């Protein structure tokens, strides 16, 4: 399996640009904030964005819980995935996710600055400061994945 690691600071538009990276590199699946996404559909895991505390969100994003970790490992193994994009805030975080999910350690690194213009980075930061989140799944999947956000 070919692994791509998209990394950058929080609020820089990684999830937004992941759609472009998936298309450009022909990537089959994405790991973003604790969920496995295939064809823009949430297929396994639970989102770190649902956590109220930063510490809990980080643990969720790196698959600290054994049940969460195993659910995603099983889903990956049940599918024919030749390439995967892992989104994280640092290379270290992505390597931790790779280790926890027992994925190949050879990573093609994609810094967000390689995919974003300075203007796009500025817009992403402004949106993040307003509390907006981009999620690389189909709109129909959003409420199922992010329960409680719309009430």
What are these regions (language model features)?
Residues 9, 34, 88-90:
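Fold-independent oxyanion-binding glycine-rich loops
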Residues 19-20, 27, 36, 87, ...:
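Polyanion-binding and phosphate-handling cores
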Residues 28-85:
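Conserved nucleotide-sensing/catalytic segment adjacent to the nucleotide-binding pocket
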Residues 39-40, 94-97, 118-121:
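Switch/connector loops and helix/strand junctions flanking conserved nucleotide-binding motifs
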Residues 107-151:
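C-terminal accessory "lid"/substrate-recognition subdomains
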